[in-house]
Amino acid sequence: MYAMKEEDCLQTFHNLQDYQDQFHLHHHPQILPWSSTSLPSFDPLHFPSNPTRYSDPVHYFNRRASSSSSSFDYNDGFVSPPPSMDHPQNHLRILSEALGPIMRRGSSFGFDGEIMGKLSAQEVMDAKALAASKSHSEAERRRRERINTHLAKLRSILPNTTKTDKASLLAEVIQHMKELKRQTSQITDTYQVPTECDDLTVDSSYNDEEGNLVIRASFCCQDRTDLMHDVINALKSLRLRTLKAEIATVGGRVKNILFLSREYDDEEDHDSYRRNFDGDDVEDYDEERMMNNRVSSIEEALKAVIEKCVHNNDESNDNNNLEKSSSGGIKRQRTSKMVNRCYN
């Protein structure tokens, strides 16, 4: 029995060395759990008299002929039957089972690269396809997460929503947007809201109770502290007085609607002005041309005010950029003191 065990172990050791030479494992001595040079000689006297289940990993490499191995009973629980070595995939599996965790840690020393070099082209293509499939699955998972995040934001924006599925939620969002658009249209028709672009409109509206012509001037521009001060000076230079004013400010934009009339110094100037407009005493006076001149004068004065707003805004942006570049930080924009003036 002992002689048979000794012969089997020696044969197994030679088989293991042949298998190592086949996979060039002699280039990686650090991954082996034992050293082939320091392997002690087999002593039958130290062999256990009461054999237990043989757990030495080298028993997996027993490649003796069937006549020799037939003397072992693989069903007695002492020795496991040797696996088939016919299929190439069994080589890697058998070696991994024999060497255990040490061989698995050996992948960092280049063993996996050596095995990958022995794979066929079809196996490499299959591995690449598997990696691409995993990458696509990960990208699809991130896309679904982004969509769910956006849907959660929409669900939180809606005032009263009980919808949970995506289709119903999107339909409710569309309906809510239509309602907001309708409300915005009503507000725009009722109240004058500033626009994002500068505009100016001057036209003659109607005659007041005294028969004086009232001119309606509407302009929209960037809001600034001295805007109304410039508007007042422009109107005074044209000897105009404001009958009514409507001012709306939203997001740094301002819209002014002014109803203007001629300002008189005395009663004689007032009568002369009315006669010129009515055309009673001055038959050759072209009333329409006079009105066009008056409207053009107001347009030029208010246009200069709007252009000053644009120029000041550009200078303010340049100064802010210069302060940021020089100090490396963001400084608070300087503002001039606002002057409130009232006029009749």
Curated annotation (Swiss-Prot):
SUPFAM superfamilies, sorted: HLH, helix-loop-helix DNA-binding domain (SSF47459)
GO molecular function, one term: protein dimerization activity
Top-level taxonomy: Eukaryota, Viridiplantae, Streptophyta, Embryophyta, Tracheophyta
Region (Disordered) location: 313-344
SS bonds (residue pairs): none
Bias type Low complexity, positions: 318-327
Mutant phenotype after disruption: No visible phenotype, probably due to redundancy with BHLH30.
The keyword DNA repair belongs to this UniProt entry's keyword annotation: no
Domain bHLH span(s) in chain numbering: 131-180
Swiss-Prot/TrEMBL keywords: DNA-binding, Nucleus, Transcription, Transcription regulation
Xref: Pfam families: HLH (PF00010)
Database matches in SMART domains: HLH
Name used for this protein in its record: Transcription factor AIG1
Oligomeric form and interacting partners: Homodimer. Interacts with LHW.
